[in-house]
Amino acid sequence: MRIDKNLPNYLTIARIMVIPVIILLFYINNSLARKLGALLFVLASITDFFDGYIARKYNLVTSFGKMFDPIADKLLVGCVTIMLLKKDNVDEIPCLLILAREFLVSGLREFLALVKVSVPVSRLAKLKTFLQMFALSILILGSKGSGIIYLDIVGEIILWIAAFLTIITGYSYFKACKTYF
């Protein structure tokens, strides 16, 4: 099967480009818009898996992809998290823990790249990302968009679990930098 050599990069760019649409749909504030926003967020989240998978499987890894894939992830999660904090009654603590960790780890990754140290992504970190995106999907939809009364509570619980894993998985980056402090 022939794959366009830029497909993983297109998926990464698409993930960034869909962020304003998700936010716009969220602020329209009706059930259909919430459902469409949640669906777009889920699809954008899925591209996070496929861009890396396709790049590795078909040897299409690029410098652009290495740099912008994590940026696209942080933008997607960060913008949606801030949107939910501003508009809905989402607990600030797990959101702030997630955002702080993402900024710190991004800086640590940049530093580690400069000193030629690689920290592989663990299964726990992949689970953390999945739970973050799953929780945010549920919270975008919320009880307002779904009609399911306790959906917000389920989303908050999953967000707290993701925040806990966020702290645990962030430690591996600090540990890798320890010799440079």
Curated annotation (Swiss-Prot):
Keyword Lipid metabolism: yes
Location(s) in or outside the cell: Cell membrane
The UniProt record lists the keyword Transferase: yes
E.C. number(s) listed in UniProt: 2.7.8.5
Enzymatic reactions: a CDP-1,2-diacyl-sn-glycerol + sn-glycerol 3-phosphate = a 1,2-diacyl-sn-glycero-3-phospho-(1'-sn-glycero-3'-phosphate) + CMP + H(+)
Residue intervals passing through the bilayer: 8-28, 35-55, 64-84, 148-168
GO CC terms: plasma membrane
Recorded metabolic or biological pathway in which this protein acts: Phospholipid metabolism; phosphatidylglycerol biosynthesis; phosphatidylglycerol from CDP-diacylglycerol: step 1/2
GO molecular function: CDP-diacylglycerol-glycerol-3-phosphate 3-phosphatidyltransferase activity
UniProtKB keywords: Cell membrane, Lipid biosynthesis, Lipid metabolism, Membrane, Phospholipid biosynthesis, Phospholipid metabolism, Transferase, Transmembrane, Transmembrane helix
One Gene Ontology term from the biological process aspect of the record: phosphatidylglycerol biosynthetic process
Membrane-protein topology: Multi-pass membrane protein
UniProt similarity note: Belongs to the CDP-alcohol phosphatidyltransferase class-I family.
Function description: This protein catalyzes the committed step to the synthesis of the acidic phospholipids.
Name of the featured protein: CDP-diacylglycerol--glycerol-3-phosphate 3-phosphatidyltransferase
Species this protein is from: Rickettsia prowazekii (strain Madrid E)
